[in-house]
Amino acid sequence: MEREQPPGPALVPRRLSDADAVLAGDPSLRVRPGIAIGKIAFIPMTLAMLVLLVHLLDRQIFSIVAQPLKAEFGLSDSQFGVLSGIGFALLYTLLGFPVAKWADRGDRALLLAGATITWSVMTALTGLATGFWTLLAARAAVAVGEAGGIAPLHSLVADLHDVSCRARAFAILQLGGPIGMFVAFCGGGLIAASFDWRTVFFVAGGIGVAVGLLVLWGLPEPRRKLPPRPVAGAVTSSGLRPLLAQAGFRWLLAGTALAGTAFYASLTWAPSFLARSFQMDVGNIGLVLGVGFGLFGVISVIAVGIVCDRLRVARPNAYCIVAACAVGAAAAFAALGLFLPSKTSSLVVFIVTVMGLSAWQVPMITAVQEYASPGNRASAAALFMLAVNLGGMGVGPTLVGVLSDMLVAGYASESLRYALLIVPVTLAGASACWLRASSLRPVSPS
């Protein structure tokens, strides 16, 4: 077993989150509004969930309009893979770390409101695109805005909740993901079928601007009221080095990159796969994917949040074990579902796969915050998003698109089916990484 080594930089008294400081005995925080001790701060969490909802909505509507968009501009699978993958993920990831540094010191609620409004306006402007290069520019502009979303969101949620209910809090936050995908696939498919793909972007952008204004009005920033208090005997250090010095955290990130590859490859290419292999139209595709990723994704996220909080009492490594089991099962069902001849049986297996694909993010997001302290929560979240987006979104959709074009000569319209085999392969790799991470404990859990 690898032995964890303490971080290299000098250690200073750890500054607990507001919620954990109350548990540590700081009476001055007991009457503070907005701090949830053993319970969920529902109003802030509702607003946080809405931010994640429009974050996924503005990102996923691109895949539901893949076929009409490709037909209008004559795009290849490789070009669409670039637009969905590395063309978005590279800028998103590069901006993530300076944004996280700001979020670790500044007003996260204000940052979230500004970022949400920015990416939503850029989403609406995507509807004015005239070809590949204007689409790429619009996607890059959306990425600039979305870079200010997830890291401060994770940091703020962790500071609002103590460790006893943190997984449930992140489960509520992550409900925005499947709900956003439901709206993107069902709503986007319906609008595209009734009007055109441009209208989809206009509507999604308007929804996002409204959410940004709500966040500006009602989302609290814990640090506005009172800074977190030092607690004797605890240690921390800010920045990335203390996190990356721990082998468990590195294994966690490796698994996250592989799972992200599978997740975003599935989200991006599932509509095209259903259209080509089962001749489904955009409206029916949106309904199937909306119910799959939306309804069953919600069930999966809620269940895994409850299970993780209960298991963690006896097993501190429960987060990694639950995530490893979920993606391991998803890998098996994904491999089976790709080659079932019947549309009905393939869709049933697809639902089970989606539940596994939806289940890993809550335990992994929570596990990342176990390694972090309030001084580097947003930085830890930025590392997580680096793995998910550059390793996952950047590689997954692009790789599938390139492989599909390479396999056209041998498999014609079925080339995408074989290119999607990277989904079960990367899920199996993620499961192995997280099982390894489960044997390693954080040096100073938060």
Question: Across the structure, where does each feature detected by a protein language model lie?
Answer:
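Extracytoplasmic gate region of multi-pass secondary transporters
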Residues: 62-63, 247-301, 357, 361, ...
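Structural signature of the two symmetry-related core transmembrane helices
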Residues: 110-124, 318-334
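Conserved MFS/SLC helix-loop-helix module at the cytosolic interface between two early adjacent transmembrane helices
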Residues: 94-133
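Extracellular/periplasmic helix-loop-helix junction of adjacent transmembrane segments
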Residues: 65-94
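Juxtamembrane intracellular "pre-TM" segments in multi-pass secondary transporters
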Residues: 28-38, 222-253, 277
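Cytoplasmic helix-loop-helix junction between adjacent transmembrane helices
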Residues: 138-178
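Helix-breaking motifs and short loop linkers at transmembrane-helix boundaries and internal kinks
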Residues: 74, 107, 128-134, 145, ...
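Helix-loop-helix hairpin linking two adjacent transmembrane segments in secondary transporters
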Residues: 173-217, 221
